[in-house]
């Protein structure tokens, strides 16, 4: 009888977005929730690096799909506006190409973007862009319910849920085609194919191997991108503070050494200090390969298969700077493309090396659509994609120097000069990410989304081990801040369903939130 009356105890391992959201939702429902995190602050991959006395966002920098958090917070009696200061971005990103003087802005206004493409390329390409937008809209509408909101989608359930009209949409897309091939059907200008092919990297993947369905990422951005005052770290900080107000017991600077089981189900976690936290339920918000490789105990090797190194998603080489810039008129989000795009992904996924000529993403965090008012040092994040082999090798100084020099040279050829002192840049490499996120090998997006079946290979929130649930970017529905938040909602809802606190139909509503329609 005591077990029935006892408030269910939950330990959430990892204070990334998925863990913060699941802890908050469960605490709001009255469960006894303890959150443990090895870092000394919340956020997981949302992290700030201190450079010259200022914090530089050095993880995710784009805030999209705000409806995921909007609906969750509405259920808690608050709103995003109550906990964050958001500003919509008009210029989604500014793009430049090596060897070309022209730039292209993607804008929140689709018609204005079409006008920009007509000037940059041709009126025919502008019309093709508008057709592309219509297809990505239909694709998103088709996949939102049967895939994004589903706790564990599979091919059979998706076919059933899609119905004839949904299947017609997928068939028209060519679901077995790669993203690169499909984009070649939409655009004749290779620069536009390159621009939209970059959306594969949002899932840590190559556009030559990713499925055509990843075109829906374009729709996500076109619906809206926001900047967060104080940086993306404020998202994690606000959710952590709200969780504690609802009763979450957060413990930072504490590592989970092992997840214990008893009689085949979860019984608690052991901390690195040796302390044991008893719990009937554990939500693991980390890279699931840590479970499969035995880093948290041998009990889970049969339930979780670690991602093999060649199946891992992208890692990164990042440079967090406080520096003066000149020349190129940067906005908040900027992309500098190389000439041989395919060679970049061959270097990373096949030759397993830092790209000789990699695309460079630059987040100028003190800028908005109109740029920087005064020529003063600004917070800059430069990111180059890299192979996720951080657990088996470390790049040597000459490799790092070559990649950095090539990246700066590419930006210089596009017109951007960065004047940075050596002590005002912090570099993070795949080996550093492998240390920050155990079991990942430095992969930042879990398993690469390669092949048309890859979307069904991510673990779901409910594991085969009773009482153990998973959340985060390495599980369904995938990487990125909104998807990780969705995974946290799915994990919390699945746990509550197993406790009999909600029905399956209620779980769909709770985890799903509002449509983008």
Regions found by a protein language model. Name each.
Residues 227, 257-374, 511-512:
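Mid-domain catalytic core of redox enzymes
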Residues 137-246, 253, 436, 440-449:
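Active-site/ligand-binding neighborhood in enzyme catalytic cores
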Residues 189-203, 357-361, 417-477:
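A glycine-rich dinucleotide-binding beta-alpha-beta segment and adjacent secondary-structure elements
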Residues 4-142, 447:
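N-terminal glycine-rich phosphate/pyrophosphate-binding loop and immediately adjacent elements
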Residues 60, 473-495:
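A conserved FAD-binding loop/helix module that cradles the flavin
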Residues 1-41, 46, 118, 124, ...:
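Structural core of flavin- and non-heme-iron oxidoreductases
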Residues 1-10, 28-29, 450-454, 503-517:
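Extreme N-terminal leader/targeting segments of oxidoreductases
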Residues 324-434:
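C-terminal segments that line or cap access tunnels to active or ligand-binding sites in enzymes
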């Amino acid at each position: 009888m005591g077990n029935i009356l006892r408030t269910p105890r939950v330990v959430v391992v990892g204070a990334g977005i998925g863990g913060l959201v699941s802890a908050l939702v469960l605490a709001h429902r009255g469960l006894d929730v303890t959150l443990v995190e090895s870092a000394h602050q919340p956020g997981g991959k949302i992290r700030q690096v201190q450079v010259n006395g200022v914090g530089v966002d050095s993880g995710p920098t784009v805030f999209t799909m705000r409806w995921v958090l909007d609906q969750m917070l509405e259920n808690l009696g608050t709103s995003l506006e109550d906990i964050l200061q958001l500003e919509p971005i008009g210029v989604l990103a500014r793009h430049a190409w090596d060897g070309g003087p022209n730039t292209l802005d993607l804008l929140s206004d689709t018609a204005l973007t079409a006008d920009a493409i007509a000037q940059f390329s041709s009126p025919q390409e502008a019309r093709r862009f508008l057709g592309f937008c219509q297809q990505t809209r239909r694709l998103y509408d088709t996949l939102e319910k049967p895939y994004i909101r589903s706790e564990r989608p599979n091919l059979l359930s998706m076919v059933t849920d899609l119905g004839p009209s949904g299947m017609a949409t997928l068939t028209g897309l060519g679901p077995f085609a790669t993203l690169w091939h499909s984009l070649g059907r939409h655009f004749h200008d290779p620069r536009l194919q390159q621009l939209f092919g970059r959306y594969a990297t949002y899932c840590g993947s190559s556009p030559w191997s990713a499925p055509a369905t990843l075109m829906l990422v374009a729709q996500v951005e076109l619906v809206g991108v926001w900047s967060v005052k104080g940086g993306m770290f404020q998202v994690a900080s606000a959710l952590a503070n709200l969780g504690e107000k609802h009763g979450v017991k957060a413990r930072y600077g504490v590592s989970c050494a092992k997840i214990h089981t008893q009689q085949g189900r979860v019984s608690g976690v052991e901390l690195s200090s040796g302390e044991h936290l008893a719990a009937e339920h554990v939500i693991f918000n980390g890279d699931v390969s840590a479970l499969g490789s035995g880093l948290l105990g041998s009990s889970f090797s049969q339930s979780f298969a670690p991602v093999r190194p060649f199946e891992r998603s992208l890692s990164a080489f990042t440079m967090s700077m406080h520096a003066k810039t000149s020349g190129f008129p940067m906005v908040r989000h900027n992309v500098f493309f190389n000439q041989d795009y395919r060679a970049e992904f061959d270097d990373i996924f096949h030759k397993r090396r830092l790209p000789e000529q990699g695309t460079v993403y630059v987040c100028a965090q003190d800028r908005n659509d109109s740029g920087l008012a005064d020529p003063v040092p600004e917070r800059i994040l430069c990111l180059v994609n890299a192979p996720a082999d951080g657990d088996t090798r470390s790049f040597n100084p000459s490799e790092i120097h070559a990649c950095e020099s090539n990246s700066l040279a590419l930006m210089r050829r596009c017109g951007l000069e960065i004047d940075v002192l050596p002590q005002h840049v912090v570099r993070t490499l795949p080996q550093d990410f492998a240390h920050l996120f155990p079991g990942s090998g430095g992969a930042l997006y879990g398993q690469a989304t390669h092949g048309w079946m890859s979307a069904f290979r991510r673990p779901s929130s409910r594991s085969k081990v009773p009482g153990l649930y998973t959340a985060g970017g390495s599980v369904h529905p995938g990487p990125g801040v909104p998807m990780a938040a969705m995974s946290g909602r799915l994990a919390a809802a699945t746990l509550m369903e197993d406790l009999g606190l909600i029905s399956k139909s209620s779980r769909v509503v709770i985890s799903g939130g509002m449509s983008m329609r």
